[in-house]
Amino acid sequence: MLANIIRIATRQSPLALWQARYVQQCLNHFYPDLHVELVPMVTRGDIILDTPLAKVGGKGLFVKELELALLEGRADIAVHSMKDVPVEFPDGLGLTTICERDDPRDAFVSNRYDSLEQLPEGSCVGTSSLRRQCQLRARRPDLVIRDLRGNVGTRLAKLDNGEYDAIILAVAGLKRLGLEERIRCALSPEESLPAVGQGAIGIECRLDDDRIRQLLAPLNHTDTAARVLAERAMNVRLEGGCQVPIGSYAELEGDTLWLRALVGAPDGSQMIVGERKGSVSDAEKIGVALAEELLAKGASAILQAVYQGQSSS
């Protein structure tokens, strides 16, 4: 293939296309003569919309088709929302670049209420994320939590049609789509701990493709990469997938990395939390150590019950 072309595999949703175009613009900023093509495709997670994500099961619902395009040489890189990226990669592929993180928080979206606290008893809140569900139920057991699938526009339409009193989405996704005005309030990490890698864009490529790796190098954001490394290291040790009730969020304070995490029962009845601080150079070790702490507190029993529920449904 020509040396001045790079092809980006991406999902077809508006948000995924925004992320791919963002990477396209970054590449063109550093390499004005580079021809960057988008290769949109549909993933299994995009097709199965009538089933809660947790029940669809399996890892990599939104990335497998993109990875196949890389392996078959139909694309050179794949752009992912980091919270959708599994902890394991096919042989020959890997995550080489993490772009600068956007706002990692969850957004409270409603047409009638300004905050979670304002919701009356029995209000219906939409989210398919087990992580969001367990934290909502622990905080507000009086609410009715219902699954909500589809792209951002579809979810907002369901809210506007009166199917829900409020929905929970990612702040970053709404901002990227120019829908920031729909955010009634952003939920702090204390209210809703984000997903692993939430708000960050990751780039996957063939590990033996030195040309592509060299082109991607300027797009890597060192601080974001360290934070996401800690969060993902914790997730790897917990053997967590994308559709599990795990929250993890790392912050940097100078050279110190502060990692918080939780594993919760989907019904909100049990919440195991922990935090660790250490040198940013030990990001991966901090993630593993925090996972060990959560496992010692009983996280494995919660996760096992979740996986059994997914396999039997």
Swiss-Prot record:
Its EC number is 2.5.1.61. InterPro entries: HemC, Porphobilin_deaminase_cofac_BS, Porphobilin_deaminase_N, Porphobilinogen_deaminase_C, Porphobilinogen_deaminase_C_sf. It catalyses: 4 porphobilinogen + H2O = hydroxymethylbilane + 4 NH4(+). Its cofactor is dipyrromethane. Pathway: Porphyrin-containing compound metabolism; protoporphyrin-IX biosynthesis; coproporphyrinogen-III from 5-aminolevulinate: step 2/4. The modification S-(dipyrrolylmethanemethyl)cysteine is found at C242. GO terms for molecular function: hydroxymethylbilane synthase activity. Binds 1 dipyrromethane group covalently. GO terms for biological process: protoporphyrinogen IX biosynthetic process. PROSITE patterns: PORPHOBILINOGEN_DEAM (PS00533). GO terms for cellular component: cytoplasm. Keywords: Porphyrin biosynthesis, Transferase. It comes from the Bacteria. NCBIfam families: hemC. Tetrapolymerization of the monopyrrole PBG into the hydroxymethylbilane pre-uroporphyrinogen in several discrete steps. Monomer. Belongs to the HMBS family. The porphobilinogen subunits are added to the dipyrromethane group. This is Porphobilinogen deaminase. It comes from Pectobacterium atrosepticum (strain SCRI 1043 / ATCC BAA-672) (Erwinia carotovora subsp. atroseptica).
